[in-house]
Design a protein with these regions (language model features):
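N-terminal beta1-alpha1 cap of cysteine-dependent amidohydrolase-like domains
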Residues: 1-112, 123-124, 130, 134-174, ...
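Hydrophobic, aromatic-enriched interface-forming segments
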Residues: 118-121
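Conserved G/P- and acidic residue-centered "switch" motifs that form tight phosphate/ATP-binding loops
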Residues: 115
Length: 194
Protein backbone atom coordinates (compact mmCIF):
# COMPACT_ATOMS: atom_id res chain seq x y z
CA UNK A 1 0.00 0.00 0.00
CA UNK A 2 1.32 3.42 -0.97
CA UNK A 3 2.06 5.70 1.96
CA UNK A 4 0.31 9.10 1.72
CA UNK A 5 2.39 12.22 1.17
CA UNK A 6 1.34 14.83 3.73
CA UNK A 7 2.48 18.40 3.13
CA UNK A 8 3.26 20.56 6.16
CA UNK A 9 3.17 24.34 5.80
CA UNK A 10 6.63 25.62 6.67
CA UNK A 11 7.71 28.78 8.40
CA UNK A 12 10.93 30.78 8.60
CA UNK A 13 13.29 30.84 11.57
CA UNK A 14 15.98 33.48 11.98
CA UNK A 15 19.14 32.68 13.92
CA UNK A 16 19.75 34.91 16.93
CA UNK A 17 23.44 34.37 17.66
CA UNK A 18 26.83 33.83 16.05
CA UNK A 19 27.04 33.07 12.36
CA UNK A 20 23.30 32.24 12.28
CA UNK A 21 22.17 35.85 12.85
CA UNK A 22 19.73 36.90 10.15
CA UNK A 23 20.16 33.59 8.31
CA UNK A 24 16.58 32.56 7.41
CA UNK A 25 15.78 28.85 7.56
CA UNK A 26 12.72 26.90 6.52
CA UNK A 27 11.39 24.79 9.38
CA UNK A 28 8.51 22.98 11.02
CA UNK A 29 8.30 21.55 14.52
CA UNK A 30 9.68 18.03 14.71
CA UNK A 31 6.45 16.80 16.34
CA UNK A 32 4.62 17.36 13.03
CA UNK A 33 6.94 15.18 10.97
CA UNK A 34 7.20 12.48 13.63
CA UNK A 35 3.43 12.29 14.07
CA UNK A 36 2.87 11.89 10.33
CA UNK A 37 5.52 9.16 10.18
CA UNK A 38 3.98 7.34 13.18
CA UNK A 39 0.57 7.49 11.47
CA UNK A 40 2.02 5.83 8.36
CA UNK A 41 2.48 8.89 6.16
CA UNK A 42 5.45 10.58 4.56
CA UNK A 43 5.91 14.18 5.76
CA UNK A 44 6.78 16.77 3.12
CA UNK A 45 7.84 20.19 4.42
CA UNK A 46 6.53 22.96 2.15
CA UNK A 47 8.93 25.92 2.42
CA UNK A 48 7.41 29.40 2.69
CA UNK A 49 7.08 31.00 -0.73
CA UNK A 50 5.05 33.71 -2.44
CA UNK A 51 5.21 31.85 -5.78
CA UNK A 52 1.67 30.59 -6.44
CA UNK A 53 2.78 28.26 -9.22
CA UNK A 54 5.18 26.48 -6.86
CA UNK A 55 2.44 26.21 -4.23
CA UNK A 56 -0.02 24.70 -6.73
CA UNK A 57 2.56 22.31 -8.18
CA UNK A 58 3.59 21.17 -4.70
CA UNK A 59 0.02 20.53 -3.55
CA UNK A 60 -0.63 18.60 -6.79
CA UNK A 61 1.69 15.87 -5.44
CA UNK A 62 0.13 15.64 -1.96
CA UNK A 63 -2.44 13.32 -0.45
CA UNK A 64 -3.15 15.62 2.49
CA UNK A 65 -2.20 18.99 3.99
CA UNK A 66 -1.26 19.88 7.56
CA UNK A 67 -1.34 23.60 8.35
CA UNK A 68 1.21 24.20 11.09
CA UNK A 69 1.34 26.64 13.99
CA UNK A 70 3.06 29.99 14.22
CA UNK A 71 2.26 33.70 14.35
CA UNK A 72 -1.16 35.20 15.03
CA UNK A 73 -3.41 35.61 11.99
CA UNK A 74 -3.56 39.22 10.78
CA UNK A 75 -6.92 40.61 12.06
CA UNK A 76 -7.59 42.66 8.93
CA UNK A 77 -8.08 39.31 7.17
CA UNK A 78 -11.22 38.79 9.25
CA UNK A 79 -12.44 42.38 9.30
CA UNK A 80 -11.07 43.54 12.64
CA UNK A 81 -8.53 46.13 13.69
CA UNK A 82 -5.56 44.94 15.80
CA UNK A 83 -6.31 45.02 19.54
CA UNK A 84 -3.84 45.61 22.38
CA UNK A 85 -3.12 41.95 23.17
CA UNK A 86 -2.59 40.75 19.59
CA UNK A 87 0.69 38.88 19.20
CA UNK A 88 3.17 39.05 16.35
CA UNK A 89 1.62 38.75 12.88
CA UNK A 90 3.11 37.84 9.51
CA UNK A 91 0.56 38.64 6.75
CA UNK A 92 2.74 37.05 4.05
CA UNK A 93 2.58 33.72 5.90
CA UNK A 94 -1.21 34.09 6.03
CA UNK A 95 -1.30 34.48 2.24
CA UNK A 96 0.99 31.45 1.85
CA UNK A 97 -1.35 29.34 3.98
CA UNK A 98 -4.43 30.69 2.16
CA UNK A 99 -2.85 29.69 -1.18
CA UNK A 100 -2.10 26.21 0.19
CA UNK A 101 -5.71 25.91 1.34
CA UNK A 102 -7.07 27.02 -2.03
CA UNK A 103 -4.94 24.46 -3.86
CA UNK A 104 -5.81 21.69 -1.37
CA UNK A 105 -9.53 22.40 -1.59
CA UNK A 106 -9.39 22.44 -5.39
CA UNK A 107 -7.82 18.96 -5.25
CA UNK A 108 -10.25 17.88 -2.50
CA UNK A 109 -7.50 16.45 -0.29
CA UNK A 110 -7.86 16.23 3.50
CA UNK A 111 -6.75 19.29 5.50
CA UNK A 112 -5.76 19.29 9.16
CA UNK A 113 -4.93 22.48 11.05
CA UNK A 114 -2.96 22.58 14.28
CA UNK A 115 -2.92 25.72 16.44
CA UNK A 116 -2.52 28.64 14.01
CA UNK A 117 -3.34 26.23 11.18
CA UNK A 118 -6.86 25.68 12.52
CA UNK A 119 -7.26 29.44 12.97
CA UNK A 120 -6.06 30.11 9.40
CA UNK A 121 -8.56 27.57 8.05
CA UNK A 122 -11.35 29.25 10.02
CA UNK A 123 -10.43 32.74 8.75
CA UNK A 124 -10.03 31.44 5.17
CA UNK A 125 -13.60 30.15 5.40
CA UNK A 126 -14.93 33.54 6.59
CA UNK A 127 -14.72 33.02 10.35
CA UNK A 128 -13.12 35.26 12.95
CA UNK A 129 -10.90 34.93 16.02
CA UNK A 130 -10.60 36.29 19.51
CA UNK A 131 -7.30 38.16 19.22
CA UNK A 132 -6.60 37.18 22.84
CA UNK A 133 -8.48 34.80 25.13
CA UNK A 134 -8.99 37.62 27.63
CA UNK A 135 -11.48 39.12 25.13
CA UNK A 136 -13.65 35.96 25.36
CA UNK A 137 -15.73 36.23 28.53
CA UNK A 138 -16.74 32.55 28.31
CA UNK A 139 -13.14 31.29 28.46
CA UNK A 140 -12.27 29.98 31.91
CA UNK A 141 -9.64 27.29 31.24
CA UNK A 142 -5.97 28.24 31.26
CA UNK A 143 -4.77 27.81 27.67
CA UNK A 144 -1.23 29.20 27.90
CA UNK A 145 0.41 26.49 29.99
CA UNK A 146 3.69 26.86 31.85
CA UNK A 147 4.35 23.12 31.56
CA UNK A 148 6.32 20.89 29.24
CA UNK A 149 4.41 20.21 26.01
CA UNK A 150 4.15 16.49 26.82
CA UNK A 151 2.14 17.08 30.02
CA UNK A 152 -1.64 17.01 29.56
CA UNK A 153 -3.15 19.82 31.60
CA UNK A 154 -6.87 19.96 30.75
CA UNK A 155 -9.64 17.82 29.30
CA UNK A 156 -11.22 18.27 25.87
CA UNK A 157 -14.66 16.78 25.17
CA UNK A 158 -15.09 15.47 21.62
CA UNK A 159 -18.47 14.94 19.98
CA UNK A 160 -19.35 11.30 19.28
CA UNK A 161 -19.50 10.06 15.69
CA UNK A 162 -17.05 12.65 14.36
CA UNK A 163 -13.86 12.06 12.39
CA UNK A 164 -11.84 13.31 15.37
CA UNK A 165 -13.48 10.92 17.84
CA UNK A 166 -13.03 8.09 15.37
CA UNK A 167 -9.36 8.93 14.80
CA UNK A 168 -8.43 8.96 18.48
CA UNK A 169 -10.89 6.27 19.54
CA UNK A 170 -12.60 8.13 22.37
CA UNK A 171 -14.69 11.15 23.26
CA UNK A 172 -12.43 12.81 25.84
CA UNK A 173 -8.78 13.67 25.67
CA UNK A 174 -6.36 15.21 28.14
CA UNK A 175 -4.16 17.68 26.30
CA UNK A 176 -2.01 20.73 26.75
CA UNK A 177 -2.50 24.20 25.33
CA UNK A 178 -0.12 26.96 24.41
CA UNK A 179 -2.68 29.32 22.86
CA UNK A 180 -3.73 32.86 23.50
CA UNK A 181 -6.36 33.01 20.72
CA UNK A 182 -9.50 31.07 19.80
CA UNK A 183 -12.31 30.94 17.25
CA UNK A 184 -14.94 33.65 17.67
CA UNK A 185 -17.23 32.91 14.71
CA UNK A 186 -17.01 29.60 12.88
CA UNK A 187 -16.18 29.73 9.17
CA UNK A 188 -18.47 28.46 6.42
CA UNK A 189 -18.64 24.68 6.16
CA UNK A 190 -16.77 24.14 9.43
CA UNK A 191 -18.10 22.59 12.63
CA UNK A 192 -16.73 22.72 16.16
CA UNK A 193 -16.49 19.14 17.46
CA UNK A 194 -14.21 19.54 20.49
Amino acid sequence: MKKPYIGISGSILLGSAGSDVDLPRSYVNLDYTRSIEEAGGIPIIIPFTTNLEIIQDTVAHLDGLLLSGGHDVYPLHYGEEPLQKLGEVWPERDHFDFALLKAAEERQIPIFGICRGMQVLNVYRGGSLYQDLSYDETCTIKHAQNQTPELGTHTVDIEFETNLASAIGRSTWVTNSHHHQSVKTVGKGLQVVA
